């Protein structure tokens, strides 16, 4: 991921594959990039793809870290728009240009979604080969395999991550999270508590999940509240917390998490948060709030046919 880009020939290949990279006008490139990110976060994937391509077009054939970063965004937008083959082409070009562990991981996820499990697993192996000390990579691979019904085989990646040498607070945070995922709650509590004492606020989040898994609701809620009060919660974590409450039938608490996520400055999963909040309002019987949020949702995501049908249904309530 951090390897220097040295091949002029491969630069030419990537330039052709992605309509050229390298900054001609850094300011203009940054404007296109930021506009693309804004479109991506609002679910306007087609415009995001165009913006990222325009950012890449500000080039003279020279590739740098910024251009690779834009390519990752472009591939994400392509995938979310449903253009999986285009996303695959973009990841192929990145990997051909620079054997990037993150690109192998993301391409592996894409292969899994396309039903090509063998290719996905091969990419995961290459990803950890390139990034042997990246905890998040191991955890991401585990989550992806688990989501595709391969939890037992996926656990080997968590065990590999535990072998990474390091006893700093950040290491303990990741190892505590991994122990939680493996069901080793005693070790998880020990590592996460030490990480928290050394200033890792996110440890409170995983301590909450660990105690919840053990049935200690009071401690779980206490740590989750502490984490929320710290102001470092991400929209993804708030979505997960809200979804858990929604599954348990606590719609008011679910809405607290969903709306807290929507109130953050950066909300890359805004669409999922809004859809879940609408569902929580409906389940709680607050159809007026559901209608209001659904109206806002359709203004941002007008092509969602299911939401359009839901709007028609709510008008009868």
Predicted regions span which residues?
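Structural marker of alpha-solenoid helical repeat scaffolds
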Residues: 58, 62, 96-97, 130, ...
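Helix-start (N-cap) detector for alpha-helical repeat units in TPR-like alpha-solenoids
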Residues: 29, 68-69, 101-102, 135-136, ...
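C-terminal motif of bacterial Sec signal peptides marking the signal peptidase cleavage site
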Residues: 17-20
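Register position in tetratricopeptide repeats
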Residues: 41-42, 80, 113-114, 144-148, ...
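Canonical tetratricopeptide repeat
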Residues: 34, 66-69, 73, 80, ...
């Amino acid at each position: 991921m951090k390897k220097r880009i040295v091949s002029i020939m491969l630069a030419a290949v990537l330039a052709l594959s992605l309509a050229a990279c390298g900054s001609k006008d850094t300011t203009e490139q940054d404007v296109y990039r930021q506009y693309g990110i804004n479109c991506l976060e609002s679910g306007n994937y087609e415009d995001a793809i165009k913006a990222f391509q325009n950012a890449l077009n500000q080039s003279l054939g020279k590739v740098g870290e910024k251009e690779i970063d834009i390519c990752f965004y472009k591939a994400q937008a392509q995938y979310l728009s449903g253009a999986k083959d285009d996303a695959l082409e973009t990841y192929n070009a990145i990997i051909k240009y620079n054997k990037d562990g993150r690109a192998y991981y993301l391409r592996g996820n894409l292969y899994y979604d396309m039903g090509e499990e063998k290719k996905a697993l091969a990419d995961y192996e290459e990803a950890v080969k390139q990034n042997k000390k990246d905890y998040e990579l191991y955890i991401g691979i585990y989550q992806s395999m688990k989501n595709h019904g391969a939890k037992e085989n996926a656990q080997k990646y968590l065990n590999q991550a535990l072998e990474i040498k390091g006893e700093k607070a950040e290491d303990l945070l990741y190892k505590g999270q991994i122990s939680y995922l493996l069901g080793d709650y005693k070790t998880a509590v020990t590592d996460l508590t030490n990480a928290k004492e050394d200033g890792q606020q996110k440890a409170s989040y995983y301590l909450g999940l660990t105690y919840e898994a053990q049935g200690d609701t009071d401690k779980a809620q206490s740590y989750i509240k502490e984490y929320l009060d710290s102001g470092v919660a991400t929209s993804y974590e708030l979505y997960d917390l809200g979804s858990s409450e929604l599954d348990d039938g606590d719609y008011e608490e679910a809405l607290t998490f969903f709306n807290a996520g929507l109130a953050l400055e950066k909300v890359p999963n805004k669409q999922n948060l809004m859809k879940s909040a609408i569902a929580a309002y409906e389940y709680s019987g607050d159809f007026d709030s559901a209608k209001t949020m659904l109206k806002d949702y359709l203004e941002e995501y007008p092509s969602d046919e299911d939401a359009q049908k839901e709007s028609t249904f709510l008008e009868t309530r």
